[in-house]
From Swiss-Prot:
<dbReference type="GO" id="GO:0070040">
    <property type="term" value="F:rRNA (adenine(2503)-C2-)-methyltransferase activity"/>
</dbReference>
<dbReference type="GO" id="GO:0030488">
    <property type="term" value="P:tRNA methylation"/>
</dbReference>
<dbReference type="GO" id="GO:0070475">
    <property type="term" value="P:rRNA base methylation"/>
</dbReference>
<feature type="domain" description="Radical SAM core">
    <location>
        <begin position="138"/>
        <end position="388"/>
    </location>
</feature>
<keyword id="KW-0408">Iron</keyword>
<comment type="function">
    <text>Specifically methylates position 2 of adenine 2503 in 23S rRNA and position 2 of adenine 37 in tRNAs. m2A2503 modification seems to play a crucial role in the proofreading step occurring at the peptidyl transferase center and thus would serve to optimize ribosomal fidelity.</text>
</comment>
<feature type="binding site">
    <location>
        <position position="152"/>
    </location>
    <ligand>
        <name>[4Fe-4S] cluster</name>
    </ligand>
</feature>
<keyword id="KW-0411">Iron-sulfur</keyword>
<keyword id="KW-0949">S-adenosyl-L-methionine</keyword>
<dbReference type="GO" id="GO:0051539">
    <property type="term" value="F:4 iron, 4 sulfur cluster binding"/>
</dbReference>
<keyword id="KW-0479">Metal-binding</keyword>
<protein>
    <recommendedName>
        <fullName>Dual-specificity RNA methyltransferase RlmN</fullName>
        <ecNumber>2.1.1.192</ecNumber>
    </recommendedName>
</protein>
<feature type="active site" description="Proton acceptor">
    <location>
        <position position="132"/>
    </location>
</feature>
<dbReference type="Pfam" id="PF21016">
    <property type="entry name" value="RlmN_N"/>
</dbReference>
<keyword id="KW-0489">Methyltransferase</keyword>
<keyword id="KW-1015">Disulfide bond</keyword>
<dbReference type="Pfam" id="PF04055">
    <property type="entry name" value="Radical_SAM"/>
</dbReference>
Amino acid sequence: MATPSLDSARAADAAIEKAPDLLPEALPGRRPSLVGLTRDALKAQLIGMGVPERESRMRAGQVWHWVNFRGASDFAEMTNVGKALKAQLAEHFTLERPEVASRQVSRDGTRKWLLRMAPTNRQEHNRGAEIECVYIPGPDRGTLCVSSQVGCTLTCSFCHTGTQRLVRNLSAAEIVQQLVTARDELGDWPGQMPSRDAGGSGEVGRLVTNIVFMGMGEPLYNLDAVVDAVGVMSDQEGLGLSRRRITVSTSGVVPQIPRLGEQANAMLAISLHAVRDDLRDELVPLNRKYPIAELLAACRAYPGLSNARRITFEYVMLKGVNDSDADARELVRLLKGIPAKINLIPFNPWPGSRYECSDWDRIERFSEIVFNAGYASPVRTPRGRDILAACGQLKSETEKLRARARLMQEEGIGVESFYAGADD
């Protein structure tokens, strides 16, 4: 396999260093949404609106219940809130969710939503940034894969999202709104009729039982928002998910790993994908900054690590690249002493990717070596491949359209009609 050029390596390193603190700001004159706010932020908004501070905790608790437990989409639904206060709330705020710009359902039942966030500046032609969110139904759980950034800086060579430039971080509210929108789409609120064929099963009848931060972006480059979002999602008087059912996946931003454990108390997943630094430098350029030894040292010190709170190591199976018996044995050696599970991920192809998925018998042999060494080594069943919703395939539809338009321009093909029909 070709080694990346010096220029591309430098570009990747520059992208890693960037990690910009880009957060959305509401357009002037636009009423903010209360959906997804933390308790403290909600209380502050009500006080700012004029609710007396001595009443603010009670009023915030009422609104919290309707927004995060009942899934209210209109202030009129809040039956235990006085008429005057409801009118005041409606004057100052909304209960808007992101716009669902498109819906796709895979043959296997996986659902992918393209979500358009509220516009944050006029340079975006009044179209908010777009992210993808995926729901994966299973026999004993329903997993929602959420995004933490619009695009990504990391340029991992096997990942489609890495080909989309970073636009900005998502706010904590925008991360939570992905769960709220999924529950809207699935009919997953108390008293609602679940969407037909939504699949899933689990505690208190919820369709969405698990959250994985494995969508667009590197969560630990937006850790403040991720910590707040986990807090809102796991509040037992609201959205009610267990923190043990919330997993945050990182490519290895080593300095932030302890804080994730201390403040979010979420389960940790590591996108490892290689057992040698030279190969991981190519697959996951962040490795040049935080090599494997440093990453695994941080894993061994992860707060709360135990056999009951294992770290998941994700390992994408690339034909002829990282799938040999020797790779499997070295993986076992590296992880010695870390309570861990190794998820083997068949590579999911995407347009323009230069890798192939390992043959199935090679994946099974790799799994057998790891399993015989005492580690659970499930092979992740590819879900949603036909709608580009599988691991490593996410990239917002608008970005795909722009890329296609650039190609058309380079080839001398007019793009005016192309963009005109993009929203049809």
